[in-house]
C-alpha cells in the first residue's frame, strides 16, 4: 500500500535485503477522482488522499531507493503520469495536480542525478483500458490503449531512457 509511508519503507528495506537494491523503479499506482473544483469545497480529503497515493507514496519509494542507486552509480526511475497533465483536463484537478507534482519533481531530480548514472523518465500515459476508467462513460468515445500497449511504453522507457514519453 504505497499510500502508507511505513509500508513504502518496509518495501524498500525488503528489496534492499533480498536483492541488494533496485535497478528500475516503475511508479504506476494511481487514484483518479472526477469531480469539479466547485463540487470539492467540502472534500479536501479527496485532494489529500490523491496526493498521498499519486505523489507522496511514489516520492517515498524514490527517496528510499535513490541512495543505493547513487552508491551503485546506476538506476532508472520511471513515473507513470497522465496525458491529463498535458491537457489540464477539467474535473480532474486533484489527479492532475498530483501527477504534475511527480512530473516536476522528476524533471528537477533528473538534472541533479544524471552525472551519477541515475535516469528519470516520465510517461504521460494516454487512457488505458482498465477498470479505473470503466465507470466514466464519456471515455467510451475517447481513444485508449490496451494494458499491453502501456507495458510496451514502459519497456521502451527502460530501453531508451528518454526524459519523457508522450
Protein language model regions, located:
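C-terminal helical subdomain
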Residues: 122, 139-166
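Rossmann-fold cofactor-recognition segment
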Residues: 1-5
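Active-site-adjacent segment of SDR/Rossmann-fold oxidoreductases
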Residues: 87, 108-119
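Conserved mid-core segment of classical short-chain dehydrogenase/reductases
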Residues: 9, 32-48, 91
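Residue(s) in the substrate-gating loop at a strand-loop-helix junction
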Residues: 82
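Conserved amphipathic alpha-helix within the SDR
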Residues: 6-20
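Active-site helix of classical SDR
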Residues: 62, 98
